[in-house]
């Protein structure tokens, strides 16, 4: 959404939907307002240096990297923005380049291409069928909930 200026906040789309995304699936984040990674410059630098990593990778690096130890809330965010290798995260930002997005471990989709393909003004929340027959699950405001499949919830 336009109100999010950093992946720090926009990545609610990642950690609030990860239990609803199929292994091998793809999450497309259309984020026209995103122009940086971190809300604070030092967190932005940390994300740019390490990218989004799995929990195991972060825990290993945390043992030896002073900058990670100095900013634990930023270090935790590196995991919040990770799919843990389960699915692909594709970002369509308004203010970050392809090189910047790919440098942190995400796939890049040009914003104009994303808007042309997915038409957020037309899509309805839930399942939508694209003109080419692809079925996509659209969530207009991923920051407003927590999504999961029955299989991922188990007996909870």
Regions found by a protein language model. Give the residues of each.
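C-terminal catalytic subdomain
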Residues: 3-93
């Amino acid at each position: 959404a336009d109100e999010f200026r950093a992946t720090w906040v926009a990545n609610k789309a990642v950690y609030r939907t990860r239990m609803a995304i199929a292994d091998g699936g793809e999450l497309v984040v259309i984020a026209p307002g995103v122009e940086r990674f971190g809300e604070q410059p030092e967190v932005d630098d940390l994300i740019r240096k390490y990218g989004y990593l799995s929990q195991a990778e972060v825990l290993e690096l945390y043992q030896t990297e002073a900058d990670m130890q100095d900013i634990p809330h930023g270090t935790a965010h590196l995991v919040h923005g990770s799919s843990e290798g389960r699915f692909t995260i594709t970002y369509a930002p308004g203010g970050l380049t392809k090189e910047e997005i790919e440098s942190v471990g995400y796939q890049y989709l040009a914003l104009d291409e994303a808007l042309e393909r997915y038409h957020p003004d037309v899509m309805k929340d839930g399942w939508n069928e694209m003109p080419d027959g692809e079925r996509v699950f659209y969530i207009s405001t991923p920051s407003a909930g927590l999504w999961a499949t029955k299989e991922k919830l188990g007996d909870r």
